[in-house]
Regions:
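Aromatic- and charge-enriched surface segment that lines or borders ligand/interaction sites
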Residues: 19-22, 41-43, 140-142, 172-215
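Surface-exposed binding/hinge segments that line
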Residues: 66, 216-261, 266-278
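N-terminal lobe/hinge region of extracytoplasmic solute-binding protein
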Residues: 126-175
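A bilobed periplasmic-binding-protein/Venus flytrap-type ligand-binding module shared by bacterial periplasmic
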Residues: 282-285, 335-360, 373
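Ligand-site clamp/hinge motif
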Residues: 286-327
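Periplasmic-binding protein-like
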Residues: 350-392, 520-526
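Extracytoplasmic/peripheral linker and loop segments enriched in polar/acidic and small residues
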Residues: 474-540
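Long beta-strand-rich cores associated with HINT superfamily self-processing modules
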Residues: 539-566
């Protein structure tokens, strides 16, 4: 980039005297800038015309001229970034920000957070990694799941922290008395992000394509067919009642993209840039629900600013400003909460590991100090003895007389807190005469894991979305973990039980049915929760409407900036 090259050359001119006037020859300047004498004369002339410096040459070859500086490279960089942002050249601004972490922190601070840019309220969020491409179906990353919920709409949606679905692309729906026909009434004022009117037939095409994905096919296995029964009505015909259907359609994995343009949605924000170093969202002017109060949101991908280890943590802090709380006086903790999501441990029963041995392992975890003495940052996790509030783990008598197997195999995936948990468990079991072989699956889910079949113990994390009970039902149906963990008859029985629970029209009856399933799994020592996460959001003053959601993010449609004072 031309601007960055000019800035780097200016830095080379400036550096030896740190801005003091220099007596120097043209050949010395050319060597410093790694260019010819002719080119350095052009550089000096351009910089002088821009008002950056003054050059008084002396006649005669090899004579020393006088070089006087008028601006520092830092102030130039700031001015260039400001100009790039004003002209909508975010990529150029980010390219100018190629500095060491501490210098970058100082440079970016004025640009991040909430700003009015060309009368447009814009929120800039530094983020620790590039975002994976959005696609239909399940996404492993919390940030991608959150983003999909803002770019795409579903027939239904969850609003705020509510666990009951409400209308989205469909304003209402009706269910037949036998639970086998669901009519979704589609709004007449819908538009894609490209400005085209949304046709109900397009929604049917997108839904049909979604249901061809293996994981989504499991989720919607009760759906027999989808028909356009009126220009403003989609009808789902089921072969067995499924009173979770509106919940299934409200989750991020069921959001609908344009059938021919997979990155075009109809949500409150549209993607205008999706690159490894920059993601920019702009508000959708024809959005069918309450319009966002911000016009643009940008993720600036700046991994050098973040602790690498925290990057794959179960609680990466969502901060809309650079710096730690003690580094920036004006940065404040806006919202914090204990997640409903949890890290878990599951045990596969086999001739090598029986139920009593599995129970003793769970007792070791919960009755010892193991969970409470993990060497992790204070406030990062909270050890738990319940799967969801009120879903307590069973209490068993002292099982220290139960002999553990001589060897066991543990496999686990991210978050990184489970590295620590695995190491602690390995050391503790060694003291009990059990050698633990540890395998790390470097991913956020079990998808594609070839070593699950080898494991006796598995550890992972379960993100809980907007409807906790439904989220756990979805987990049992779709996660690759369960067919490996349970025998074929056990897994078939589990799926049949889930089918029976979903036929209950009464929500409380469905919740009770799911609680009974998990209570039995916990009683049989198949699963136990380990700890919950602590989510937090920090933001500078003037960024309002920030409230944590169930994914540890905040609703982009509710954030707002006060108008700048004249």
């Amino acid at each position: 980039m031309r601007q960055l090259n000019r800035l780097n050359q200016y830095q080379r001119l400036w550096q030896p005297s740190e801005g003091a006037t220099q007596q120097v020859t043209i050949s010395e300047l050319a060597a410093r800038c790694f260019c010819s004498e002719r080119h350095v004369r052009t550089l000096l002339r351009q910089a002088q015309d821009a008002g950056w410096l003054s050059w008084r040459a002396q006649s005669g070859r090899g004579k020393r001229g006088e070089l006087t500086f008028h601006v520092s490279p830092e102030s130039l960089r700031n001015a260039m970034m400001e100009e790039a942002l004003k002209s909508g050249q975010q990529h150029n601004a980010l390219e100018l920000a190629q500095l060491a972490p501490e210098d970058l922190r100082v440079l970016l601070h004025p640009f991040l957070g909430g700003h009015w840019q060309n009368d447009t309220p814009t929120l800039r969020i530094p983020y620790y990694r590039s975002l994976d491409p959005l696609h239909p179906g399940f996404l492993p990353g919390r940030a991608e799941q959150h983003l999909a919920g803002h770019v795409f709409s579903g027939l239904t949606r969850f609003h705020g922290s509510g666990s009951e679905p409400t209308g989205d692309l469909a304003h209402h729906w009706e269910v037949s008395a036998d639970g086998l026909r669901w009519h979704f009434y589609i709004r007449s004022t819908l538009h894609w992000h490209n400005g085209d009117k949304i046709e109900t037939a397009q929604l049917k095409r997108s839904l049909t394509a979604l249901l061809t994905l293996p994981a989504l096919r499991k989720l919607f296995q009760s759906v027999l067919r989808i028909d356009v029964t009126h220009p403003q009505c989609l009808t789902f015909t089921l072969h067995q009642p499924d009173h979770w259907l509106a919940h299934r359609l409200a989750t991020y994995c069921s959001r609908l993209a344009h059938p021919d343009q997979p990155m075009t949605g109809s949500g409150p924000f549209k993607l205008s840039v999706f690159d490894p170093e920059l993601v920019r969202l702009e508000s959708h002017e024809q959005y069918h629900l309450s319009h966002p109060l911000l016009k643009a949101i940008e993720y600036w991908i700046t991994p050098t600013l973040f602790d690498y280890g925290l990057g794959t943590s179960c609680r990466h802090p969502v901060q809309i400003a650079i710096g730690e709380l003690d580094e920036l006086e004006n940065l404040r903790l806006v919202s914090s909460s204990t997640s409903l999501g949890f890290c878990y441990l599951t045990l596969k029963h086999s001739p090598r590991l029986n139920t009593m041995q599995a129970r003793r392992l769970i007792n070791i975890i919960h009755l010892s100090t193991l969970l409470h003495t993990l060497p992790l940052n204070e406030g990062l996790i909270t050890p738990t003895e319940e799967l969801l509030p009120g879903w307590d783990i069973p209490q068993w008598p002292d099982l220290t007389d139960v002999r553990l197997p001589e060897t066991l195999t543990l496999i686990y995936h991210l978050p990184v807190e489970l590295h620590t948990m695995a190491n602690q468990l390995k050391q503790y079991l060694a003291q009990q005469g059990c050698e633990l072989r540890v395998i790390f699956h470097d991913a956020k889910t079990w998808d594609g894991c070839q070593q699950l079949a080898e494991a006796d113990i598995m550890m992972g994390d379960r993100l809980i979305g907007e409807a906790p009970e439904y989220t756990l039902e979805q987990w049992l149906r779709c996660d690759a973990l369960w067919p490996h963990l349970l025998s074929a008859p056990q897994f078939a029985h589990l799926q049949a039980t889930l089918d029976a629970v979903q036929t209950q029209a009464d929500e409380q009856a469905r919740h009770a049915g799911l609680k009974a399933i998990f209570s039995q799994l916990m009683e049989n020592a198949v699963i136990t929760p380990l700890f919950n996460y602590q989510y937090q959001i920090s933001a500078p003053p003037g960024v309002n409407g920030i409230r944590l959601n169930t994914r540890g993010w905040f609703d982009f449609t509710e954030a707002w900036l006060p108008a700048p004072k004249s």
